[in-house]
């Protein structure tokens, strides 16, 4: 199959689910990931077969004999055909509605590659913007980072999380999911102690398995229900950040099947009659764990900006780059 034929096949197979431009972009992602084919090849070499474009490193001529051994050539051919099959299989998965990030097994967030899959919410651009705001604010504060260190723990263990008021600059990510916020902040501030918690064991497994290059220590991840009281033994925090569930159940009708059928509902939705339940719980955690001069960063449903801000005296509602009320910051 040629590059052009594969792109056209993607557009055709994915047309019931995605607009043409989005389906085409997905085709390019599959070609790049599985076949090492950059998107510009669609224009410059549209008739190139996928198999011949794949694994080109195997086709370097032997420097001494100027020939490729038959066994190596056959192995390379098999590898290339396997990759073409993998690419077509990935397209089949996409055609069922499975998210591209789950098919690839990762997503990009704040310049890092995060593992994602079933049971783990896919990070969104709005959350990247939230992290960027935290980073900008902390860099603006000369006292934002002081020495500290941590070690990672497995889900379900909270007993040894002990620190006193003299602990280093600390950040807590509530409803951490994939751990994208916690890891991104740990990468940016190597001297800070970063914690992340979630109730979902599946999400915590992903959070603990991330392999983000750090100059400091790994975040500490622990199991906790944000709707319950904070576990004993946690330190005071200088920053609490959260992207909790905030989409009302009644908003499901406006969402795509690739979200509704695959991503964890418990990480997305709240009851229509209690849309602020997680924010009230976060307020209780902040009352106990946030230092008096600490900062709070929350991602919110644009419909409830003023309602969320009212739970956190001194906070303000901040719009995202699209102009929608998306954050409450204090």
PLM ranges: what are they?
Residues 1-26:
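Non-catalytic nucleic-acid substrate-recognition regions in nucleic-acid-modifying enzymes
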Residues 7, 27, 87, 97-100, ...:
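A general structural signal for well-ordered alpha-helical segments in protein cores
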Residues 89-147, 156-209, 230, 323, ...:
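SAM-dependent Rossmann-like transferase core, predominantly class I methyltransferases
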């Amino acid at each position: 199959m040629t590059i052009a034929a594969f792109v056209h096949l993607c557009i055709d197979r994915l047309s019931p689910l995605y607009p043409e431009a989005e389906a085409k972009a997905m085709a390019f992602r599959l070609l790049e990931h599985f076949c090492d084919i950059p998107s510009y090849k669609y224009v410059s070499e549209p008739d190139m077969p996928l198999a011949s474009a794949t694994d080109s490193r195997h086709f370097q001529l032997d420097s001494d004999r100027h020939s490729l051994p038959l066994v190596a050539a056959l192995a390379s051919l098999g590898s290339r055909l396997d990759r073409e099959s993998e690419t077509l299989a990935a397209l089949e998965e996409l055609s069922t509605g499975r998210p591209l990030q789950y098919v690839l097994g990762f997503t990009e967030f704040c310049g890092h590659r995060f593992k994602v899959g079933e049971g783990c919410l896919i990070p969104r651009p709005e959350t990247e913007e939230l992290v960027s705001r935290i980073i900008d604010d902390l860099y603006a504060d000369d006292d934002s980072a002081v020495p500290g260190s941590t070690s990672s723990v497995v889900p379900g263990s909270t007993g040894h999380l002990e620190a006193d008021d003299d602990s280093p600059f600390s950040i807590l990510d509530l409803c951490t999911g994939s751990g994208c916020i916690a890891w991104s902040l740990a990468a940016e501030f190597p001297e800070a102690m970063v914690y992340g918690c979630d109730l979902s064991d599946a999400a915590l497994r992903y959070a603990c398995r991330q392999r983000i290059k750090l100059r400091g220590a790994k975040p500490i991840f622990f199991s906790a229900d944000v709707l319950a009281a904070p576990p004993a033994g946690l330190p005071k925090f200088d920053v609490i950040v959260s992207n909790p569930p905030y989409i009302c159940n009644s908003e499901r009708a406006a969402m795509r099947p690739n979200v509704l059928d695959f991503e964890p509902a418990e990480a997305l939705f709240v009851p229509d009659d209690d849309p602020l339940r997680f924010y009230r719980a976060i307020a209780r955690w902040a009352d106990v764990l946030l230092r008096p001069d600490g900062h709070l960063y929350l991602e919110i449903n644009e419909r409830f900006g003023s309602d969320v801000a009212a739970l956190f005296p001194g906070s303000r509602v901040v719009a995202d780059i699209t102009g929608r009320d998306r954050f409450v910051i204090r």
